[in-house]
Amino acid sequence: MAGRIVLLNALPLTAIPYDTATILVKQLSIERFREELRNFIEKGYEIVSYIRHKATVDLLEKMLNIKLNVSSELYKFSENDLVYIVTLAPEKVVRGQEITDLKPGDLIYYYVVIVKGAWI
């Protein structure tokens, strides 16, 4: 059985159920992000979004040709999760303003690996 892809706009440390964990974060290009997710989709991975920003969810739906839900649920890490963070580029953030029109280049894409224990 395939695992699940988790899409977040940030990684809350309270979502990690370990006393000690090692976290590796790798920034991805737009192309690499699309390619990785499309490959996982083809392999039958479930994609779960914990992103509540509608414009980001709408853009991801277009980029990946899938249906996602806007979600305000709390994420809890599971060992088989493949975690991706999709967040607004700092230069696009305007305090107190809702961004409604996004292009793929307005976002930054990360792949996150979370491992129980200290590996540093």
Which residues are covered by each model-predicted region?
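Initiator methionine at the very start of the polypeptide chain
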Residues: M1-A2, I120
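N-terminal low-complexity, intrinsically disordered segments
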Residues: G3-G44
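Intrinsic-disorder/low-complexity peptide segments enriched for small residues
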Residues: I5-L11, E35, I66, N80, ...
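Generic low-complexity, intrinsically disordered sequence content enriched
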Residues: L11-P12, P17, I41, M63-L64, ...
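A general marker of short, structured functional hotspots
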Residues: T14, S29, E36, E46, ...
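Intrinsic-disorder-associated interaction segments
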Residues: I23-I30, R34, F40, S49-H53, ...
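Acidic, low-complexity, intrinsically disordered interaction modules
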Residues: V48-V94
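Polybasic, proline/glycine-rich intrinsically disordered low-complexity segments
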Residues: F77-I120
